[in-house]
């Protein structure tokens, strides 16, 4: 009798086990990791106090603030690169840019680094974790960056990061009624700004920047130069020459050197 009961129980359990196995086999794969990239610094912090710089709308397409992107995803524990893009142009009118990563990426913890605004990878280090802000002593480009640690598992597969500007902008306005005859340009030598920034927003190194601007007669004279931050308050020296383009090495007017402070995502304005 006991043997008969055991046999009946076994027969009753078998279909249940088979049915449970079928349900398990039909579970869909977990969705791939998706990154949503937004822009935090859509305007300079003090843009409303500077007439020479126009405020951008807060609801423009992503590409109106940051035209290009490059990203690298690393395993948090090993540092190995899991996925990396080249520099690509941002297209479309989305305000937040979705990036679908490879479905082959396993669950885990990762570090995502995103750079924006560059035309190529020349200024970015080989490991993608730092950037030369003023390559070859030039002003370089208006670069954005974000970096974040990401948990990817069955419950966390959609993550948003925000791009922040790495540099500030120097604006020089000509307020004199008339400049000496023949002046149609300016040459700036800026001494004492940071040279590099890494993915932790740590600035290092020191460099000088040279910038030349030319203008047409009767043109409203405003020059704008994108610069990395100063090492300290009033720690950057500006030497300015007003020149004629035909002989830029012989300045026609040289104001007194001034100390300035450049800050990330801020406008510094001088008037002559």
Predicted feature locations:
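Bacterial Sec-dependent N-terminal signal peptides
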Residues: 19-47, 265
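Short structural boundary motif marking the start of a folded domain
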Residues: 29-36, 67-69, 110, 168-170
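Beta-strand-rich domain onsets/edges
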Residues: 23-31, 158-168
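Tryptophan-paired
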Residues: 60-125, 181-267
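Short amphipathic, basic-aromatic surface patches that mediate peripheral association
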Residues: 35-62, 174-178
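Beta-strand elements of well-folded, non-transmembrane domains
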Residues: 41, 75, 165, 176-178, ...
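Sec-dependent bacterial lipoprotein signal peptides
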Residues: 1-20
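Extracellular beta-sheet/turn segments enriched in Thr/Pro/Gly and aliphatic residues
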Residues: 134-166, 175, 255-272
């Amino acid at each position: 009798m006991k043997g008969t009961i055991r046999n009946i129980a076994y027969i009753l359990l078998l279909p249940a086990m088979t049915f449970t196995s079928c349900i398990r086999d039909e579970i869909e794969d977990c969705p791939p990791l998706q990154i949503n990239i937004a822009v935090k610094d859509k305007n300079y912090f003090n843009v409303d106090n500077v007439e020479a710089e126009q405020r951008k709308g807060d609801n423009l397409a992503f590409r109106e603030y940051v035209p290009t992107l490059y990203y690298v995803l690393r395993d948090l524990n090993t540092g190995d690169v899991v996925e990396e893009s080249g520099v690509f142009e941002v297209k479309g009118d989305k305000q937040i840019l979705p990036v679908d990563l490879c479905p082959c990426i396993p669950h885990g913890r990762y570090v995502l680094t995103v750079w924006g605004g560059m035309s190529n990878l020349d200024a970015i280090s080989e490991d993608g974790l730092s950037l030369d802000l003023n390559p070859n002593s030039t002003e370089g480009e208006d670069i954005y960056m974000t970096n974040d640690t990401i948990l990817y598992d069955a419950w966390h597969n959609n993550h948003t990061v925000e791009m922040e500007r790495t540099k500030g902008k120097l604006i020089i306005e000509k307020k004199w009624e008339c400049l000496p005859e023949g002046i149609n340009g300016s040459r700036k030598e800026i001494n004492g700004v940071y040279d590099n920034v890494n993915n932790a927003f740590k600035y290092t190194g020191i460099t000088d920047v040279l910038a030349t601007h030319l203008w047409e007669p009767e043109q409203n004279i405003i020059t704008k130069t994108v610069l990395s931050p100063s090492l300290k308050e009033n720690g950057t020296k500006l030497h300015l020459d007003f020149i004629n383009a035909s002989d830029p090495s012989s300045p026609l007017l040289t104001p007194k050197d001034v100390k300035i402070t450049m800050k990330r995502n801020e406008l510094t304005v001088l008037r002559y």
